């Protein structure tokens, strides 16, 4: 499907050349049964779970992740083809199902599932953003999308995943007993610290995880062979967990704000000059976000830029530095440049 798009991340927009359109349609048609199953499941609701046995079964994890990613890519293809062929109803339906699928994979009781679910939010955000001008959403439909996405509490999700990971890793130490004697205590201590840290706002969570990572890295230098095992698992991987949660919270806030701006345009016939101008009833409040326009990475308001072709809402992102709204990939990939900030744009 990536090859059919002619690019790793994009299906051409209406009016752009697409030599592989017929092949893309053929792929979509071959998978009609799978698409119907996804649409039916999303309309009913429910949860999709990785069959966890709390063992380090990486093949099972990879299989689950591949299936989830494949489902999102298939829906992305369907939405893109529908937009390209001027079928906004089918385009909206595919995006609604993608949101439903994203909700269904929340609450995974392990870190692999948590990280895998978060990775699909970027794909979902990109699809909503790029196809927004071609989907012909109503204000009520956009409001429902906001409500669905804002129903997720990422800090609680991460707490659950950490608890499950604790069970998995404590069990794995049995393979090396007695060389790992005492490692279980270290894992339980870290799990308690991590879950308690998540009672704070995201900027505090990030700082505390970084502090713990630095501490464990220093302690690791005093250990030898297998006795280093409990310290190996803490840093730097453990720091990425909080960053992943904050990344998902930021991405969701950007979608929420972006759809609110589009609803503002539907209501007032123009785009707002600032985010503060957006009617408060257009912004959905999330369970874990007291202020929907706050950047999880620094606790400050999300940034808003009015540019010649778009209005851009952006977060400073993982590096916690404001790079002025650097959210675009290098289209030529000459320098393999990725975006430094995270954004959601609305075409003017």
Feature annotation, model-predicted:
Residues 1-348:
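Short acidic linear motifs
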């Amino acid at each position: 499907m990536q090859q059919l798009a002619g690019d790793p991340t994009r299906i051409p927009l209406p009016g752009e050349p697409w030599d592989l359109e017929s092949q893309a349609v053929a792929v979509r048609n071959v998978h009609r049964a799978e698409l119907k199953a996804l649409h039916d499941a999303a309309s009913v609701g429910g949860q999709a779970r990785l069959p966890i046995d709390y063992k380090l079964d990486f093949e099972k994890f990879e299989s689950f992740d591949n299936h989830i990613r494949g489902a999102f890519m298939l829906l992305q293809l369907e939405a893109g083809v529908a937009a390209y062929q001027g079928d906004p109803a089918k385009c909206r339906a595919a995006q609604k199902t993608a949101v439903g699928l994203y909700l269904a994979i929340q609450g995974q009781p392990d870190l692999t599932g948590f990280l895998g679910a978060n990775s699909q939010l970027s794909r979902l955000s990109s699809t909503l953003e790029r196809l927004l001008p071609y989907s012909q959403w109503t204000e009520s439909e956009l409001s429902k999308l906001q409500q669905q996405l804002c129903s997720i509490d990422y800090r609680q999700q991460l707490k659950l995943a950490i608890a499950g990971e604790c069970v998995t890793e404590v069990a794995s130490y049995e393979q090396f007993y007695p060389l790992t004697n005492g490692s279980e205590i270290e894992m339980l201590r870290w799990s308690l610290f991590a879950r308690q840290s998540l009672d704070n706002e995201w900027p505090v969570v990030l700082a505390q995880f970084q502090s713990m990572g630095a501490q464990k890295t220093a302690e690791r230098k005093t250990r030898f062979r297998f006795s280093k095992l409990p310290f190996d698992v803490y840093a730097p991987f453990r720091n990425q967990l909080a960053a992943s949660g904050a990344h998902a919270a930021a991405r969701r806030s950007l979608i929420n704000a972006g759809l609110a701006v589009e609803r503002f345009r539907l209501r007032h016939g123009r785009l707002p000059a600032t985010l503060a101008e957006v009617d408060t009833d257009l912004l959905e409040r999330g369970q874990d976000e007291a202020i929907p326009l706050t950047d999880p990475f620094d606790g400050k308001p999300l940034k808003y830029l009015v540019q010649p072709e778009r209005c851009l809402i952006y977060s400073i992102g993982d590096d916690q530095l404001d790079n002025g709204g650097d959210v675009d990939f290098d289209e030529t990939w000459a320098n393999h440049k990725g975006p430094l900030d995270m954004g959601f744009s609305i075409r003017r």
